[in-house]
Amino acid sequence: MRKIILLLFVMPLFLISCDKTIKSEKGAIDIISNVYFNASKGLTDHKQFYISKINYVNDDIIELVPNIQAPEFIDSVYYIKDTLFYQPKAFEEAKSIIFKEEQVTGSPKSIYKKRFGAVWVNIPIFDYEKRKDIADTVLYNNKSYKRFEINTPDNYSVYYVHPTDTIIPYSLNPIADKAYKGRLERIDSYDKKKDLFSTIWLIHRQQMDKEAVDIFQFNRDLAEKVSKTASK
């Protein structure tokens, strides 16, 4: 009887440990899109868009939004904390952004209302209920992906979810992430009427952008100065 009770106690713990996730403390996320025009005639007529460079340290996020025409230049910088974003700033102004000051004096808005750079969503993918699971695949760097497709009269899309227990502070669609126990990292979509093929990539990396590193370092240095002054 004791063995049965012990087994009943251990099993839930085992199931919980299997579902345990790991929160990434530091890193960067690139959101990149490729658009192919007149896709049925080939994939030579295309353009790449660098949508966003998301850099994070714990719950503090610095999003660099590149210029559409010249992605090596930064158009605007967002400070994001948890589920709130603050007024975007020009890059030169953002170099001296003070996180604590933004949190106290800023006018934050829900990240789900953000419309430039990376877009946060908390709703299902359009026509998600029509999805059909298809064969798993392996792409670049030997990464495995679970896949599902959505086929409608106007569009055909394939979604790629990489199985992982590591949580990062941005998701192309958290509902799909949860359902397929991973991270949605790629979406291929073909607009049948416009003959337009597009793909969007989420690329997670450990190394942060120097521009963001400098902003985080500025805030760390400032916090140390305040702490030393307070201790005197």
Predicted regions and their residues:
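Sec-dependent signal peptide recognition
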Residues: R2-F9
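Exposed boundary/loop context
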Residues: V10-M11, A135
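C-terminal motif of bacterial Sec signal peptides marking the signal peptidase cleavage site
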Residues: F14-S17
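Bacterial signal peptide processing site
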Residues: D19-T21
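Extended soluble regions of mature proteins
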Residues: S24-K232
